[in-house]
């Protein structure tokens, strides 16, 4: 998979903010959609506090590694999927995390069967789709093609 292309797509969807902000769920976040964890040095920082570009990149790199690891856990044949499907699944994994994406059982059945339309239909039939409609529309369209 072209990791640079994945990184560009996620950066486009997430945006990049070099300070602590609240995401659409009201959770502290910084950089390229990095949810502040208790283990992060930024934990407890006030909204609006600046975060260095280097730290934002470091967090994004770590997040991408975790996303790809989670993709392989959820889809053991992840490397054998078409690259476009790999990037779609990875984008969704970045956005939702493995606990939520693992609940997309119909989508997983579609991907496992290489039935891209069935997988796309299951993507649409979700709360995630209603929450991030523009992003979801792009990913669904790509899955269908």
Task: List PLM regions with ranges.
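Long, amphipathic alpha-helical surface segments
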Residues: 1-19, 25-26, 34-36, 51, ...
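Conserved functional hotspot residues at active sites or interaction interfaces
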Residues: 30
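Alpha-helical segment that forms one wall of the substrate-binding/catalytic cleft
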Residues: 43-75, 83-90, 94-101
């Amino acid at each position: 998979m072209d990791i640079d292309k994945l990184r560009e797509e996620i950066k486009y969807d997430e945006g990049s903010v070099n300070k602590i902000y609240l995401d659409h769920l009201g959770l502290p976040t910084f950089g390229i959609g990095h949810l502040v964890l208790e283990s992060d040095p930024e934990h407890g920082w006030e909204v609006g506090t600046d975060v260095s570009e280097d730290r934002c990149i470091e967090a994004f790199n770590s997040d991408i590694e975790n996303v790809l690891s989670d993709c392989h856990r959820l889809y053991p044949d992840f490397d054998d999927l078409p690259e476009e499907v790999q990037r779609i699944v990875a984008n969704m994994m970045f956005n939702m995390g493995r606990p939520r994406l693992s609940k997309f059982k119909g989508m997983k059945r579609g991907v496992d069967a290489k039935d891209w339309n069935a997988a796309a239909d299951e993507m649409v039939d979700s709360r995630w789709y209603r929450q991030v409609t523009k992003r979801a529309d792009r990913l669904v369209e790509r899955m269908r093609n």
